[in-house]
A protein has these predicted regions:
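Aromatic- and glycine-rich beta-strand/loop motifs that create alpha-glucan
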Residues: 1-36
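Short alpha-helical transmembrane interface motifs in multi-pass membrane proteins
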Residues: 2, 25-28, 63, 74-79, ...
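Membrane-interfacial helix-loop-helix junctions in multi-pass membrane proteins
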Residues: 22, 53-57, 187-244, 257
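Short, hydrophobic transmembrane alpha-helix segments
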Residues: 27, 47-57
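Pore- or pathway-lining transmembrane helices of multi-pass membrane proteins that form conduits
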Residues: 31-37, 171-190
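Hydrophobic alpha-helical transmembrane segments of multi-pass membrane transport proteins
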Residues: 39-44, 61-133, 153-154, 158, ...
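Alpha-helical transmembrane segments and their short interhelical loops
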Residues: 104, 108-179, 226-250
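Short cytosolic juxtamembrane segments of multi-pass membrane proteins
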Residues: 251-258
Length: 258
């Protein structure tokens, strides 16, 4: 048992490192993705901050949506990780990985960790741009560590979802279509840019079962307050969801090549 756990951790690290090397050799994707949160904060956030029609729990609107835009950036990176699996299959890399003794869960965790690292780079972009806009954030060692943890867990959740989708649809075209369809509904059916309390009843139900909402909750507490009140439940939801996604993804992973 100990040897198995050790192998899973080691292989996950190796696979994550491989993905990180790809990012270092071709950072253009992250650069292009960094434009989106900058536009959301700089245009959408600035415009709605003048309206003052949305209750923001005592914060400015820019403060309120900064954790939401950070979450959006991480989710948009993670949700397309299934596409990389399909690309690996098309190039023959996936088939080679599947015939090795590498545990399936390690293949999944390697992708999840890689997505988390990409998500952290997006988090840095969002925080820096928010500070440039004059947004007051709680920057401390505790908050930074908490943000890293939540970003990694959130990336794991949505990478797992992405891998499950890839295992079902199996083609790039279908995956891109479904990816585009689910990302914006996930974002808007959460508390990222407005509180759940002002949503219609049915939408509140969706928001309360949407993992993205718990990611935003945790980040909002860490980034805007000096407390950690309620963050334990948010972390619990993310951890449990990430584990469930890991197990399902590991089980479905080989189906990509069938």
């Amino acid at each position: 048992m100990f040897n198995y756990i050790s192998q899973v951790i080691t292989k996950s690290y190796v696979l994550a490192e491989m993905e990180a090397r790809k990012l270092m050799h071709d950072p253009t994707e992250l650069i292009s993705r960094a434009v989106q949160p900058i536009l959301w904060l700089g245009i959408f956030g600035e415009a709605l901050s003048k309206v003052r029609a949305i209750p923001t729990q005592g914060f400015t609107y820019l403060q309120f949506i900064t954790p939401g835009i950070l979450t959006q950036s991480v989710v948009f990176v993670a949700i397309f990780y299934g596409l990389y699996i399909i690309m690996d299959r098309d190039t023959g890399i996936l088939q080679k990985l599947l015939v090795t003794p590498t545990p399936r869960i390690a293949l999944v965790w390697g992708k999840m960790i890689s997505a988390g690292l990409r998500g952290l780079t997006m988090a840095v972009v969002v925080v820096i741009f928010a500070l440039i806009l004059g947004v007051k954030l709680n920057i401390s060692i505790l908050s930074i560590l908490g943000i890293i943890l939540i970003v990694m867990l959130g990336a794991a959740v949505f990478t797992g979802l992405s891998m499950i989708i890839a295992s079902i649809v199996k083609t790039r075209e279908r995956f891109m279509g479904i990816g585009q369809v689910i990302t914006l509904p996930l974002f808007f059916a959460s508390n990222a840019i407005y509180p759940i309390s002002i949503m219609p009843g049915w939408m509140q139900v969706v928001a309360n079962i949407n993992p993205l909402s718990y990611m935003v909750n945790g980040l909002r507490v860490l980034m805007l307050t000096n407390t950690t009140t309620g963050i334990g439940f948010d972390l619990l939801v993310l951890v449990v969801t990430a584990l469930v996604m890991s197990v399902i993804s590991a089980w479905m992973y080989p189906k990509v090549v069938i």
